[in-house]
Regions:
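Intrinsically disordered, low-complexity N-terminal segments that are enriched in acidic
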Residues: 1-89
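Hydrophobic/aromatic-rich core segments of domains that either
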Residues: 139, 171-259
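Hydrophobic helices that insert into or interface with lipid environments
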Residues: 238, 274-275
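Secondary-structure boundary elements
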Residues: 13, 76-80, 86, 96-167, ...
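Short, surface-exposed linear segments at secondary-structure transitions and domain or protein termini
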Residues: 44-47, 94-97, 230-239
Length: 275
């Protein structure tokens, strides 16, 4: 299947403002592109591309005073298959984990494991190791937090989501990640596109989505505590310890987001053609 995705973002700056952007698709999905995915600017801006320590495709710019619009639109191939559920994936002993995975066991800005460890062990220590434990954590978070756009809070941590019991997709992800790490399961934050493909249309405006991945059986596996069901058509943009590492923009100076439009939709198949 084909998916068309993109965005239009507007920023208002009072002075030249350096910015870091994580707005490209993840390098692991480049081979699936059916058209170029290029960031365009409505101002004469030079962008420098680089790969961060987590392997994300990032950009550096200096936004001029006034309004700057950043946009992209592309088509990408997707298998059309839902997320894989690795029922038999085993949990590694700490000493068997690859070196580059260990960082995803540690607490981070939004995943405050030290405040959740006692609860996590009391609640999940009796569950089977491996995927069954991840699913138990996912089930808990899905039932514990109520999704509410009006309760979004960029300062809320995993423990904040635990106590507030409300939030948006990043809050589901942060709490689930923190609980997994408490139980010695490496977990990392993911951001990207997730359209209403194969599910009822959400009447709310489209947004970027957040989910997470766990390292079991030698591989990273997709998990979504907000929806708690395999979904179709994820397009990964970035991975990191938490939302800090994959913020769509980080401005080193005053910058106001004045426009935010995200699109993700399946491209109708032409009659007589198959993907």
């Amino acid at each position: 299947m084909k998916i068309r995705a993109g965005f239009n973002l507007g920023y208002e700056c009072m002075q030249p403002t350096p910015m870091l952007l994580v707005l490209n698709i993840h390098p692991s999905r480049r081979a699936d592109l059916l058209s170029d995915q290029i960031l365009t600017f409505d101002q004469p801006i030079e962008a420098w591309s680089y790969t961060d320590v987590f392997g994300n495709a990032c950009s550096r710019i200096v936004a001029p005073p006034g309004r700057t619009t950043i946009s992209t639109e592309f088509e990408i191939y997707d298998s059309g298959q839902p997320d894989i559920v690795p029922d038999d994936a085993v949990q590694h002993a700490i000493n068997d984990l690859p070196d580059d995975v260990l960082v995803f066991l540690l607490g981070s800005r939004y995943c405050d494991t030290d405040r959740l460890a006692d609860f996590a062990w009391a609640r999940f220590s009796s569950t089977p190791l491996g995927w069954a434990r991840v699913q138990a954590i996912c089930d808990f978070v899905h039932d514990h937090i109520t999704f509410d756009y009006l309760k979004a809070d960029v300062l809320r941590t995993a423990h904040g989501g635990f106590t507030d019991k409300a939030g948006v997709c990043r809050d589901f992800a942060h709490l689930a990640i923190a609980l997994c790490r408490c139980m010695n399961i490496p977990a990392r934050y993911c951001t990207g596109y997730l359209g209403d493909i194969g599910v009822p249309i959400d009447p709310n405006p489209m947004d970027f989505s957040a989910w997470f991945e766990v390292f079991l059986g030698g591989h990273w596996h997709t998990v979504d505590a907000r929806h708690n069901t395999p979904r179709i058509g994820r397009i990964l943009m970035g991975t990191g310890r938490d939302a800090t590492d994959v913020a769509m923009s980080t401005a080193f100076g005053p910058a106001t987001l004045s426009r935010f439009e995200v699109t993700t939709e399946e491209v109708p198949q032409e009659a007589g053609k198959a993907d």
